[in-house]
């Protein structure tokens, strides 16, 4: 007879909203798609008009939340970054222009696509705890991401490949208690060496 078998250990329910619970592999996957615009901040951004730095951007991706506060995402983005250069390069087009202070410059456009992987941190859940399933709490959430990617310039005679760094702060407004659909506002920085 096993005397230690007489007392069984059973899991106890807890209301601790800060406990870490991982999920099964197929749970908590998501897809993302966003369109927006960005401003290219290069070395010569001040020689021309600000409107000449604005460009559209498209991103699609897939990700997974491992815990309510920590996840990863794989993302593909494509855009062109418009800016200015004080010398002709692979990225410049058109004729020479002159700034108000007499500085000569050229308009530039860098076409690129980027594949990146990022770690995501749901700041709302990390600081306030998990709100529970189908809850009307935390309908507004803030998510920070940091990652690394591979960026490819295209449409120039010499193709360029380089590493990229990614920083992002996202505000999500969920539209249902299930939190399966949201409208997001993102501030994102993609950092890369332009080599011109």
Regions inferred by a protein language model and the residue ranges of each:
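Hydrophobic, lipid-facing positions within transmembrane beta-strands of outer-membrane proteins
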Residues: 29-31, 56-60, 113-117, 163-169
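Gram-negative (and chloroplast) outer-membrane scaffold detector with strong preference
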Residues: 68-165, 175-179
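Short glycine/proline- and aromatic-enriched beta-strand/turn motifs that initiate or cap beta-hairpins
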Residues: 1-63
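Solvent-exposed loop/turn segments connecting transmembrane beta-strands
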Residues: 47-53, 154-164, 196
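Extended serine/threonine-enriched, polar tracts that run as long, contiguous segments within proteins
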Residues: 164-196
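Transmembrane beta-strand segments that form the barrel wall of outer-membrane beta-barrel proteins
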Residues: 31-43, 78-79, 141-154, 187-193
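Transmembrane beta-barrel domains of outer membrane proteins
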Residues: 22, 54, 61-63, 120-124, ...
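Membrane-spanning beta-strand positions in outer-membrane beta-barrel proteins
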Residues: 30, 71, 143, 170, ...
């Amino acid at each position: 007879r096993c005397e230690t078998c007489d007392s069984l250990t059973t899991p106890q329910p807890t209301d601790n909203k800060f406990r870490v619970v991982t999920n099964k592999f197929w749970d908590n996957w998501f897809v993302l798609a966003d369109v927006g615009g960005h401003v290219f901040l290069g070395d010569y951004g001040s020689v021309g008009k600000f409107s000449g730095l604005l460009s559209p951007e498209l991103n699609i991706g897939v990700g997974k939340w491992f815990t309510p506060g920590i996840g990863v995402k794989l993302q593909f983005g494509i855009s062109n970054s418009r800016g200015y250069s004080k010398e002709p390069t692979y990225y410049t087009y058109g004729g020479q222009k002159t700034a108000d202070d007499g500085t000569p410059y050229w308009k530039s456009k860098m076409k690129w696509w980027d594949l990146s992987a990022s770690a995501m941190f749901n700041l709302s859940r990390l600081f306030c705890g998990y709100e529970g399933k189908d809850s009307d709490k935390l309908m507004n959430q803030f998510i920070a991401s940091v990652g690394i990617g591979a960026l490819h310039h295209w449409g120039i005679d010499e193709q360029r490949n380089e590493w990229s760094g990614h920083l992002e702060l996202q505000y999500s407004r969920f539209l249902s208690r299930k939190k399966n659909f949201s409208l997001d506002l993102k501030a994102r920085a993609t950092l890369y060496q332009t080599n011109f």
